[in-house]
Amino acid sequence: MQYDPKGTTGEFNRLMVDIKNTIPEEYQAFIQEKSKVTSAGELSEKDKWLLLLVSSVTAKCPVCIPRAVKHCLDSGWSKKEMLEACMVAVLVGGSSVMTFVTLVAKAIEELSE
């Protein structure tokens, strides 16, 4: 399968630096909102990253998936737990979403190394 989670994440990070330099106030507002949403509250930060992974799959976002997988791995989620959670996205989005679950599996393979 032609999918490069590490390359996708690297390119995303490079482009985000350009966006930060071009529109710093808007970029900072986005980062603050992201930090607020992903910080622990009633739900743990770990749980929120799993929810973000499932949301990324449901949204069919190939750029979001490796970033969410990396955060999930760093938070201690197992491959089995992540894939099981992603099946909820398939329940909501149907078989076309299953193709994005394969991107999760690929990202887990590459980012676990």
What do the predicted segments below correspond to?
Residues 1-47, 99-113:
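Acidic, glycine/proline-rich low-complexity segments that act as flexible tails and inter-domain linkers
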Residues 83-107:
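C-terminal structural segments of small proteins and small subunits
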Residues 51, 55-67:
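Short, thiol/selenol-centered motifs that function as redox-active sites or metal-ligating centers
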Residues 48-56, 85-91:
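Alpha-helical scaffold segments that form or flank carboxylate-/histidine-based iron centers
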Residues 67-79:
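Iron-sulfur (Fe-S) cluster-binding segments and ferredoxin-like electron-carrier domains
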Residues 45, 79-80:
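Alpha-helix N-capping/helix-start residues
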Residues 20, 41, 58-62, 76:
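Residues at alpha-helix boundaries and short interhelical turns
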